[in-house]
Amino acid sequence: METDEAQDMSQVSGKESPPISDVPDDADEPMPVPEDLSTTTGGQQSVKNERVLAGNIKIETQSDEENGRACEMNGEECAEDLRMLDASGDKMNGSHNGPGSKAMSGVGGIRLPNGKLKCDICGIICIGPNVLMVHNRSHTGERPFQCNQCGASFTQKGNLLRHIKLHSGEKPFKCHLCNYACRRRDALTGHLRTHSVGKPHKCGYCGRSYKQRSSLEEHKERCHNYLQTMSISSNLYSVIKEETNQSEMAEDLCKIGSERSLVLDRLASNVAKRKSSMPQKFVGEKCLSDLPYDATTNYEKENEIMQTHVIDQAINNAISYLGAESLRPLVQTPPVGSEVVPVISPMYQLHKPLGDNQTRSNHTAQDSAVENLLLLSKAKSVSSERDASPSNSCQDSTDTESNNEERSGLIYLTNHIGPHARNGISVKEESRQFDVLRAGTDNSQDAFKVISSNGEQVRVYKCEHCRVLFLDHVMYTIHMGCHGFRDPFECNMCGYHSQDRYEFSSHITRGEHRFHMS
């Protein structure tokens, strides 16, 4: 059952639900309600809320002293029970010499010069004798209206009629748009708001609209607190609140929208950098002149401390993950008669039968050329512990750009490496098993397959700008995040422009970035 039923059923034990006035459409006579106190005597004032609607209509919420205990209903439902009409305007206004005076003398009270009655016990002011009579029941404990089914008693007839609906299950107020039905007219009014299409309450800053004012106020609290945290001047809101002319309002909203777009662009840029850039330390001054707010000193210090802590931890994790050997330059070991020749790392090797008449005098020079062209300082020698790594065992969701290269298993090497001198060995033109297999492509670059020692194809990634090969997709993604969006040799962290890939790699390796004012 609903809260009304739980409340009314509790009246059997002797306690009554709040005697809030309620006159349904089928009520025999109107039941008045006490008037709100505007003045009291001797500190005996009872707190009440009153609204004069039109003429003799009164709406009020009665106190716990008069009602026993407050009902656990929402405000809209209570408003229906509080709406009372007095049919006799003469009695409401109070005639000194008419029949109303006899009724007043019967219920007691003190006549005031304005024609109203004052309770001689607590000092509450009532507009008529009926209202004062209902009020006196809170002092005497009289509850003349009793339910013949459960025995619950009430001080007003309207409350009894509302209680009887709980037993009968009657829900006369039905929604014409859905199957919703209720016992109270004000509850139906609140329900109809859920079907309304319009959202009259609009935020002047971001333009979002809401059906209820309370939702708009909650949104403004979040919006204002966010903007105050970002140190944006609060005069933008005062302009919106004080502006009444629609044309001037639209002008101000355009300014606010442009400044808000700058803030959102900066936030989006920061998110992209955090996702795709290499962990770096930021040194020097941060001159963010393009932002519509002034970054305070405290904000800069907290931001730099947080970045330093997170970046240091990320670098330590990367070193422990990759190992110290990955930071050393790769040195190719010249073959010493073995049929296994290393290509990129000891894990990925080439199988080639070597002839006795092959000369190896130029192996050292060729190995040096390969090392200079293939900057493999960031590639890690994958061990058996990395077989279960997610980046090696399954397809990564961000690996869509290199899917074609992965399916074909091709590694695009530089044009400076001759077809007969790769990785320190002389490669014949014919292809054979467990070897570097040359595949024809549409571009001018040479394409190769890297085969591991057990005959499996190796997945590799290449940066076309720096001509660097990566065996790990995470390291490849971190490296690609360092390239700028407009210019590949522009540092995505600080905007530094490099002349070529060598200067760019040197700048990234040093890891010291400084913001430059444009």
Swiss-Prot record:
Tissues and organs where the protein is expressed, per its UniProt entry: Expressed in embryonic hematopoietic organs such as the bursa of Fabricius, thymus and spleen. In the adult, expressed in spleen, thymus, bursa and peripheral blood leukocytes.
ZnF bounds (C2H2-type): 117-139, 145-167, 173-195, 201-224, 461-483, 489-513
One term under GO cellular component: nucleus
SUPFAM superfamilies in the cross-refs: beta-beta-alpha zinc fingers (SSF57667)
Regions of compositional bias (Polar residues) in chain numbering: 37-47
Stretches for region Disordered: 1-51, 381-405
Family recorded in the similarity comment: Belongs to the Ikaros C2H2-type zinc-finger protein family.
Physiological role: Binds and activates the enhancer (delta-A element) of the CD3-delta gene. Functions in the specification and the maturation of the T-lymphocyte. Also interacts with a critical control element in the TDT (terminal deoxynucleotidyltransferase) promoter as well as with the promoters for other genes expressed during early stages of B- and T-cell development. Function is isoform-specific and is modulated by dominant-negative inactive isoforms.
Protein name: DNA-binding protein Ikaros
Species for this entry: Gallus gallus
Top-level taxonomy: Eukaryota, Metazoa, Chordata, Craniata, Vertebrata
Gene name per UniProt: IKZF1
